[in-house]
């Protein structure tokens, strides 16, 4: 898209052939030229052998510019512009290139697929089919190898590391022998054993119960977490999409003897069961005597949020951390009564409460001059977009921010049409409507500098008034 302009002088017809241009011409405005005459000037347009048609009439010091909506493409006949009067008239608009749109579309299509689907015309059908099959195979391999990354991106930020280790996953070259050994041992039943051991990191104590995992951390449905024990083993707790909560153990690269590690895990588990209920919080170290704390650094943020919930287990933990000697016995009784499902509901509830606040802040944009654009609802992602130079149709309700009085509205009427970005409406609308898609709804808070300024409008809008508009985009042309 590029700028286009033309000056038509009195008595000098200006010919224009759309076929000589590289794209479609959009004429958006006519402006009166400089001069001393105070008489009106009229610009006319004639296509081919047809009679001239008057486009607009401009009067000095009163009406010196006029918005237009004219389009000329390579299918049109030659056009001739003429001016009657003593002053010239300037036509302006923009050129919409043909080839660039096609190139952009093909480029976007290639990027979205992640595969080169183009083939040269010289390739025969057999070569094309084989190449396409290879690309599909590569694409499937790509999806399989990046399953972990996709699931991490889709899961909400809950302070828990998400990782899935599948038996079918290809091992790295350096650890190929060790991974093969791990699979053979896992087939003997070792992957059925479950153990979670928390390690150093945050200063948050962890509750335990008979029905919980060994560190007392409930595992939300659809999540998986990774922890590490003192012997160097990595434990991965994976919950599949069907909620089976299957747990599988992955050994570290340097661990060669998996059977010996499993025996150590059993021994450590038995010792933990004997010591259950006897753990006392260490205030100086900020952790339980067994050293059990969550590894994730931002777990402190989750703990601080869950403290605000009345009756939750984390609230009991906060109180016990202040008086460890008096509340250690009470804490042991409470954690036996608590079920993993209750604690999972508490943690997931905390995450759900955080999400609306974050999303709300991301839907409000505040500009330095005071303009506020708030997204109320979204239309279709592939809907037409409102960009400068395009004609948009909107429904709106205009109010005074001071008292909420409605001064203008077209609800129940035909949508209001205007060309975006050419100054035909107040600046707050040109900026606030830009970027909307069909079906989007926004609330615009417009300062006087981008509204009607110190003059006001029509007696209904006082000077220096802040305005609010509820705007819905109906159509884009």
Curated annotation (Swiss-Prot):
Hey, what tissues is this thing expressed in?
A: Broadly expressed in leaves, flowers, stems and roots. Detected in root apical meristem region and pollen.
* Major site of localization recorded for this protein: nucleus
The protein's matches in Gene3D superfamilies, at most eight in alphabetical order, are given as:
3.10.50.40, Nucleoplasmin core domain
The EC number(s) given in the record are 5.2.1.8
Gene Ontology molecular function, alphabetical: histone binding; peptidyl-prolyl cis-trans isomerase activity
* Domain of life of the organism encoding this protein: Eukaryota
Reactions catalysed, semicolon-separated, are:
[protein]-peptidylproline (omega=180) = [protein]-peptidylproline (omega=0)
Please state where this protein is localized. Nucleus
Chaperone as a keyword? yes
Q: Does the keyword Ribonucleoprotein apply?
A: no
Record's GO cellular component, any one? Answer: nucleolus
Arranged from A to Z, the UniProt key words for this protein are: Chaperone, Isomerase, Nucleus, Rotamase
Q: Where is the composition biased (Polar residues)?
A: 299-321, 351-366
The record's listing under Pfam families reads: FKBP_C, NPL
Residues covered by the PPIase FKBP-type domain: 389-477
For region Disordered, the annotated ranges are: 104-135, 153-366
Which example biological process does GO assign this protein?
Answer: nucleosome assembly
First-level EC class: isomerase
- According to the UniProt entry, which residue ranges have a biased composition of type Basic and acidic residues? 322-331
Q: Which residues fall in a compositionally biased region of kind Basic residues?
A: 264-274
State its role: PPIases accelerate the folding of proteins. It catalyzes the cis-trans isomerization of proline imidic peptide bonds in oligopeptides. Histone chaperone possibly involved in H3/H4 deposition to the nucleosome. Associates with 18S rDNA chromatin and negatively regulates the level of its expression.
Subunit structure and binding partners? Interacts with histone H3.
PANTHER family from the entry?
39 KDA FK506-BINDING NUCLEAR PROTEIN, FKBP-TYPE PEPTIDYL-PROLYL CIS-TRANS ISOMERASE FKPA
Q: Which family does it belong to?
A: Belongs to the FKBP-type PPIase family.
What is this protein's name? Answer: Peptidyl-prolyl cis-trans isomerase FKBP53
| The species this protein was found in | Arabidopsis thaliana (Mouse-ear cress)
């Amino acid at each position: 898209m590029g700028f286009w302009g033309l000056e038509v002088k009195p008595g000098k017809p200006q010919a224009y052939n759309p076929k000589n241009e590289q794209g479609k011409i959009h004429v958006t405005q006519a402006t009166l030229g400089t001069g001393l005459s105070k008489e009106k000037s009229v610009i006319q347009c004639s296509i081919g052998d047809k009679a001239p048609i008057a486009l607009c009439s401009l009067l000095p010091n009163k009406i010196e510019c006029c918005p237009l909506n004219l389009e000329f493409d390579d299918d049109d006949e030659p056009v001739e512009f003429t001016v009657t009067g003593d002053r010239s008239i300037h036509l302006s608009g923009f050129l919409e290139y043909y080839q660039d749109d096609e190139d952009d579309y093909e480029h976007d299509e290639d990027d979205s697929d992640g595969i080169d689907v183009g083939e040269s015309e010289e390739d025969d059908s057999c070569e094309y089919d084989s190449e396409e099959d290879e690309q599909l195979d590569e694409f499937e391999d790509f999806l399989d190898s990046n399953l972990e990354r996709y699931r991490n991106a889709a899961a909400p930020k809950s302070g828990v590391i998400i990782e899935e280790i599948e038996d079918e996953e290809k091992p790295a070259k350096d650890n190929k022998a060790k991974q093969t050994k791990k699979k053979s041992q896992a087939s003997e039943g070792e992957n059925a054993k479950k153990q979670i051991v928390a390690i150093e990191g945050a200063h948050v104590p962890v509750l335990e119960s008979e029905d919980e995992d060994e560190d007392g951390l409930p595992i939300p449905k659809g999540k998986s977490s990774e922890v590490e024990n003192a012997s160097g083993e990595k434990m991965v707790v994976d919950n599949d999409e069907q909620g089976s909560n299957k747990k599988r153990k992955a050994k570290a690269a340097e661990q060669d003897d998996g059977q010996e590690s499993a025996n150590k895990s059993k021994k450590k588990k038995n010792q933990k069961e004997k010591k259950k209920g006897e753990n006392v919080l260490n205030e100086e170290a900020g952790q339980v005597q067994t050293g059990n704390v969550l590894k994730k650094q931002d777990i402190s943020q989750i703990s601080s949020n869950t403290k605000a919930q009345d009756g939750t287990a984390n609230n009991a933990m906060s109180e016990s951390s202040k008086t460890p000697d008096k509340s250690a016995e009470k804490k042991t009784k409470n954690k036996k009564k608590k079920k993993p499902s209750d604690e999972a509901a508490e943690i997931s509830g905390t995450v759900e409460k955080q999400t609306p606040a974050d999303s709300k802040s991301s839907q409000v944009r505040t500009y330095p001059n005071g303009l506020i654009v708030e997204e109320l609802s979204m239309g279709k992602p592939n809907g037409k977009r409102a960009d400068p130079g395009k004609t948009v149709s909107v429904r709106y309700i205009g109010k005074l921010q001071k008292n909420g009085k409605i001064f203008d509205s077209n609800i129940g009427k035909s949508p209001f049409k205007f060309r975006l970005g050419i100054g035909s409406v107040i600046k707050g609308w040109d900026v606030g409507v830009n970027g909307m898609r069909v079906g989007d709804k926004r609330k615009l808070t417009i300062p006087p500098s981008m509204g009607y300024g110190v003059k006001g409008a029509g007696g209904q809008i006082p000077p220096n008034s802040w305005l609010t508009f509820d705007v819905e985009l109906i159509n884009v042309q």
